[in-house]
Amino acid sequence: MFGTIFNTVMIIAGSIIGGIFKKGIKDEYQDILMQAMGFAAVALGINAITQHLPDSKYPILFIVSLAIGGLLGQIINLELRFNKLVNKFSKSNLAEGLSTAVLLFCIGSLSILGPVEAALHGDYTYLLTNGMLDGITSIVLASTFGFGIAAAALVLFSWQGSIYLFAQVMESAINTDLINEITIVGGILILSSGLSILGIKKFKTLNLLPSLLIPPVVIFVIHAFGLRF
């Protein structure tokens, strides 16, 4: 868990540094930083999709995942619940920034592969690299959205910790297909978040979060019953 703890600390430290900078940044500079973060999220999302979709063995799984996950998220109304919770502590656009931070920090090859490598081989390279990148990203995000970005560190710790424990318990269930499908869906969510920040269209990205749970379930069923497609 050392790598996950390091990653978490880097996000908190970066958020503190960025939050301090925010107090001295004029509105027009904050606006341009928001645009920069929006474009960065769009680019990262497109990169994840184009990099992993060609290697997918289940080319329609991401569509099914988004449809089922979106319906579940809409029924629960995660977006509304999340915004209400965040708005209790902040009247700014922190909710939008925090949701983007959670997606950027948690959905990516390094953030998923890192805990797996640490659990199975004791290799922290991915997590340490991810921690450095997330630290820099959190500085930029917090300089735009404020100290509240640090809350994403708790989500990341829970996310990576869960993957770490799952990898230890279910070593044989972890494979490249699973990571590939999760990354494709995650890339679409990051793209959606970036478009929302840019103001192109306000997508209910958080309502799509349950989509990330569908690929593990489907792939587990496929392997458990030896299904072929």
UniProtKB/Swiss-Prot annotation:
Induction: Up-regulated by mta. Keywords: Cell membrane, Membrane, Transmembrane, Transmembrane helix. GO terms for cellular component: plasma membrane. It is a multi-pass membrane protein. It is found in: Cell membrane. PANTHER family: INNER MEMBRANE PROTEIN, INNER MEMBRANE PROTEIN-RELATED. This is Uncharacterized membrane protein YdfK. It comes from Bacillus subtilis (strain 168).
